Amino acid sequence: MHGLDGLGVSTNSRSPSRTTEIAHKPPRRGLIRRLFGRKSLEPGWRDYEIAAARYLEGLGFRSVEVGDGGSDGGVDVRVRGRLVGQVKAHQAKVGRPPLQQIAGVASAEGVNAVFFSKAGYTKTAVEWAVAGEVGLFTISFDDDHFDVRAVNSLGGRLKP
C-alpha cells in the first residue's frame, strides 16, 4: 500500500462526497504512448484506484492507502482499522462473487467493505450487498474528472 501524497490528484472541495477530480490535460497521442505505454486518453485502472482513495479522503478518512497492484488479496484501497475496498475499471458489470471476496476480507479484519465499479453492478450483486454489508459506488471518468456516486444506502451513509 502506498500513501497518496504527491500523486497530483486533487479533490473537488465544493462537493467532496460527490466528485473526485484528477487534473487532466490530454497530451499528444504519441507522447501518451511513450510515457504510459498506451494509446488511449482513458485513465488506467491505477487512476481509478487513486480516484476512489481521493473520494474517501474527501469524506474525511485519513491515511487512505492505495494497493501496489501486486498480491494485495483483492484490496485496492484501505484505511487501516476502518475499511477495505476494491475498485474495478472493467467494462462489464460487477457480479456477486467480487463483493463476497471483499466482504470476506473485511470480516476477517473486522472493518467495513466498500466497492467501486466503472460499469455498475448486476441486480443480484446489489441485492447481495445489503446482506453482505458492502457499500457500493460507481466511478466514472468524464472529460477531465472522475465522478463517484453511492449506489446503495450503505455507500451513502459511509462516514469516517
Could you describe each region identified by the protein language model?
Residues 1-160:
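Mixed-charge (Asp/Glu-Lys/Arg
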